Curated annotation (Swiss-Prot):
Molecular function GO labels: metal ion binding
Name of the protein: Immune protein Tsi3
Residue numbers spanned by region Disordered: 53-85
Positions where lipid (S-diacylglycerol cysteine) attaches: C16
Assembly mode: Forms a heterotetramer with Tse3 consisting of two Tse3 dimers and two Tsi3 dimers. Formation of the complex inactivates Tse3 enzymatic activity.
Species: Pseudomonas aeruginosa (strain ATCC 15692 / DSM 22644 / CIP 104116 / JCM 14847 / LMG 12228 / 1C / PRS 101 / PAO1)
Residues where lipid is bound covalently (N-palmitoyl cysteine): C16
Keywords of the record: Calcium, Lipoprotein, Metal-binding, Palmitate, Signal
Pfam families membership: Tsi3 (PF22211)
Role noted for this protein: Immunity protein that plays a role in preventing early activation of toxin Tse3. Occupies Tse3 substrate binding site and prevents the substrate from entering.
Binding residues for Ca(2+): E126
Taxonomic lineage from the root: Bacteria, Pseudomonadati, Pseudomonadota, Gammaproteobacteria, Pseudomonadales
Gene: tsi3
Length: 145
């Protein structure tokens, strides 16, 4: 009976991972203490406050994300969303796009002690607001050491 339960739990975990489609391949540590994981298929560059990720390959609409450490809290009027064991504040803005649809920009922050970890991402979509699954997964995994 324990074996069956273990197998079912393993299958459920695999289904969750496959459904999200978010995989990471390398842990990156910034001199400011920010620790993030690089998404598979993305190039990473260190910036003054964090990291920038650019989707590689010959894509029509490559995604771009930035993760940074921020000292100032986000504005209080942002929407909130559950993120892991905590909560994140966020906003999504839409601009008219080109042939690939509207451009959407996510800005989201989660508390990390007295500081904040901030993710910003942009995606183009012809089908309405994207889920930003990668950006949310990146923010959830990011931490300060």
């Amino acid at each position: 009976m324990k074996t069956v339960a273990l197998i079912l739990a393993s299958l459920a975990l695999l289904a969750c991972t496959a459904e999200s489609g978010v995989d990471f391949d390398k842990t990156l540590t910034h001199p400011n203490g920010l620790v993030v994981e690089r998404p598979v298929g993305f190039d990473a560059r260190r910036s003054a406050e964090g990291f920038r990720f650019d989707e590689g390959g010959k894509l029509r609409n490559p995604r771009q994300l930035e993760v940074q450490r921020q000292d100032a809290p986000p504005p209080p009027d942002l929407a909130s969303r559950r993120l892991g064991d905590g909560e994140a504040r966020y906003k999504v803005e839409e601009d008219d796009g080109g042939s690939a649809g509207s451009e959407y920009r996510l800005w989201a922050a989660k508390p990390a002690g007295a500081r904040w970890i901030v993710v910003s991402a942009s995606e183009q979509s012809e089908d309405g607001e994207p889920t930003f699954a990668l950006a949310w997964a990146l923010l959830e995994r990011a931490r300060l050491q």
